[in-house]
Amino acid sequence: MDIIKITSPQAVGSVKLKVTGRPKLILVNGHWNRLLHSFNMSPGKPKYEYWSYFLSYMGAFDAFIETAQAYFGDKNYQGKPFYADGSSLLGGDQSGNDRKIKGYQYAMQNIAEITKGVGNEKIYFISHSEGAAYAAGMAKALIEKGYKVGESVMLSADEGDEFTVEGNYPCYQITAGYIEEEEYLLSYISPIHPSTIKKPKRKFHIDPIVGDHRIQGVNRYGLYISFNTKFETVHGSTINVQIFNILKRLKRLKVIPRKLKGKTEYIIAGGNIIWHKIDNTVVVNKNIDIY
């Protein structure tokens, strides 16, 4: 907690106003669409309604916020998160850098509202999809104005190859993929006598909406398997309480090289169940047969 002492020009002697600063959590949503929402394919509104679309079961949203606050490790947060709408209009009418610029402009124009009650405490960001670029712009503006960004978490960041982060605050990017079994021929004789021996193999598929793009300037980028998801649901699967445990693991894991049959491959020290790629390095995973 930070105590700011403000002395009025009219104050007599030691008459002072004490303002208590408290950390603030900012949630920046991605693209939403009312028409697609009518088919249950997208959030239909921004801000709280966007996040609660993915956290729909009872108590899930509150649990998400509480777990996020514990993850960031600060204390005495402001009562409610601040919401920012990072959505483009059509989902393809803005580049990542366009949205970063918009986020920067929004923060500069609304600096008092965004930082209300913060004092000298830290601001923390959680963004999803298109909101990641917008959050990057907001963070840039806040730091330029002298505020402290404690950390920014970017979930399923869209168009990560079209914007950067400055690197002057902790920023972690995480994207999900899913596993799908595909049948492969074990042998092939001829078109007249094709092989009928098939074996299913597990293939990793990345989130089709955002692809594999590490944002320049992030501290670390992780691409992981979101089990029990599929093509239609993997993009929103990063918005869940467990994502913060995954982020903790991302921060502390170690990637090490090993030689196997004359080739170098990369493994995660202590074993690997969920990770497919760390930063620019694909890692061995026993749950993936085909990369």
Regions found by a protein language model. Name each.
Residues R22-P23, F54-A63, Y134-A136, A141, ...:
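Extended low-polarity, hydrophobic cluster-rich segments
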Residues L89-L90, V165-Y291:
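C-terminal catalytic-base region of ester-bond hydrolases, centering on the histidine
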Residues P9-V19:
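Long, low-complexity ectodomains and other extracytoplasmic segments of secretory-pathway proteins
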Residues L25, N29-W32, G96-P208, Q216, ...:
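Serine-dependent carboxylesterase/thioesterase catalytic core
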Residues K18-N120:
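Active-site catalytic motif of lipid deacylating hydrolases and related acyltransferases
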Residues M1-I4:
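A short beta-strand micro-motif common to beta-rich folds, especially ectodomain repeats
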